[in-house]
Swiss-Prot record:
Known role: Part of a membrane-bound complex that couples electron transfer with translocation of ions across the membrane.
EC number: 7.-.-.-
Keyword annotations: Cell inner membrane, Cell membrane, Electron transport, Flavoprotein, FMN, Membrane, Phosphoprotein, Translocase, Transmembrane, Transmembrane helix, Transport
TM spans (from-to): 24-44, 79-99, 125-145, 220-240, 248-268, 271-291, 297-317, 321-341
Cleavable signal peptide: none
Native source species: Haemophilus influenzae (strain ATCC 51907 / DSM 11121 / KW20 / Rd)
Localisation per UniProt entry: Cell inner membrane
Entries under HAMAP family matching the protein: RsxD_RnfD
Cofactor(s) needed: FMN
Family in the record: Belongs to the NqrB/RnfD family.
Protein name in the entry: Ion-translocating oxidoreductase complex subunit D
Major subcellular site: membrane
InterPro entries from the UniProt entry: NqrB/RnfD, RnfD_bac
A cellular component term, taken from the record's GO annotations: plasma membrane
Length: 358
């Protein structure tokens, strides 16, 4: 006798653990690029995040009466922790990443029943909670370490994260005192300050002469565009490996680029559209966060609509909101719309009566 099983009867052969490991591997170019430009802080933040995430997930699954090792072996919690660790300032206090990781794992994932049940991206839940609750710590960024007279060593990074001082007793602001201009803000922050208030910089060309930009007349942000290109390379790798689909990142980036380009013709002073694409978390969000298979749309047309919606929200927040980046908020707002998008884009079952026909 044959045993009857439910569909699907064929599958891609990709296990969840394999997908998560491919995603982690694809993040490594950006991970090492971030170390090169911003120091060892991201290494320590990642270790703290992954350790906290594993402990939190273990306890949560144990309390639900299930076997933790069966769930931890899919590496999804490690990917969530790594995404959050790479999204926060590298030298944020240790308790920032611990709180954010606990919120991501417990409030963003386990409270809904675990992997596959959460409607919102867990890492972005943790990030947004941190950004709203601790805005100072979450917006204090060190400029690229090649601009510093004394770049922080691994020991300095450890000391800064756990005590707020380097091994020589210097604070983060004291390390950057020799750099002119805005030193503890991202280039997107600097541009936002510029076009909202002309009292800080006389004209846009003075802005892009700041050391945090390339200093050659372009508005590409030093360190940031290299990290975004690394995320782009990793994202293309995931598409070629068929770990993610192309529709979401392409729709997101094209929508944002078109809106940003159109805005440039209105005289609304801001960074160029191309510079916007390689600033902040744009490529990170497009290829590694918005493409989360659990919280994104599942239909081909729905993926395009979802990606375009994320791009629209990023544009609205960056150009007209109070936050300089907006990728995290854009993804969470778009996650809300996923059930509606899937409802209207799901293909009809063969033989199902269409509207107006009996």
């Amino acid at each position: 006798m044959f045993k009857m099983v439910s569909s699907p009867h064929t599958h891609s052969g990709k296990l969840t653990a394999h997908i998560m490991l491919w995603a982690i591997l694809a993040m490594m170019p950006a991970f090492f690029t971030q170390i090169y430009y911003f120091g060892f802080g991201v290494v320590l933040q990642s270790a703290l995040a992954i350790g906290t995430a594993i402990i939190a997930e273990f306890i949560a699954i144990k309390l639900r009466g299930k076997k933790p090792l069966n769930y931890l072996s899919d590496f999804s919690v490690a990917l969530t922790a790594l995404i959050l660790a790479m999204a926060i300032p590298p030298y944020a206090p240790y308790w920032i990443i611990i709180i954010g990781t606990l919120c991501a794992v417990l409030l963003g994932k386990q409270v809904y029943g675990g992997l596959g049940q959460n409607p919102f991206n867990p890492a972005m839940i943790g990030y947004v909670i941190l950004l709203i609750s601790f805005p100072l710590q979450m917006t204090t960024w060190m400029p690229p370490i090649n601009l510093l007279q004394e770049p922080p060593t691994f020991s300095d990074a450890f000391s800064l994260i756990f005590s707020g001082l380097t091994t020589d007793g210097f604070t983060l602001s004291q390390l950057t005192h020799n750099i002119d201009g805005i030193t503890q803000a991202t280039p997107l922050d600097s541009a936002k300050i510029f076009y909202k208030s002309h009292t800080q910089l006389n004209d846009f060309y003075e802005l892009i002469k700041l050391p945090i930009f390339m200093g050659n007349g372009t508005d590409f942000a030093q360190g940031w565009w290299q990290i975004n290109v690394a995320f782009l390379a990793g994202g293309i790798f995931l598409i070629l490996k068929r770990v993610i689909h192309w529709q979401i990142p392409v729709a997101m980036l094209v929508t944002f680029f078109c809106l940003a380009t159109a805005t440039a013709f209105t005289g609304f002073t801001h960074l160029s559209a191309i510079s916007q694409l390689v600033s902040g978390a744009m490529m990170f969000g497009a290829f590694f966060i918005a493409t989360d298979p659990v919280t994104a749309s599942i239909t081909p047309r729905g993926k395009i609509i979802f990606g375009a919606l994320v791009g629209l929200f990023v544009y609205l927040i960056r150009y007209h909101g109070n936050y300089p980046d907006g990728v995290a908020f854009a993804i969470l707002l778009s996650n809300i719309c996923v059930p509606l998008i899937d409802h209207y884009t799901r293909p009809r079952v063969s033989g199902y009566p269409t509207k107006g026909r009996k």
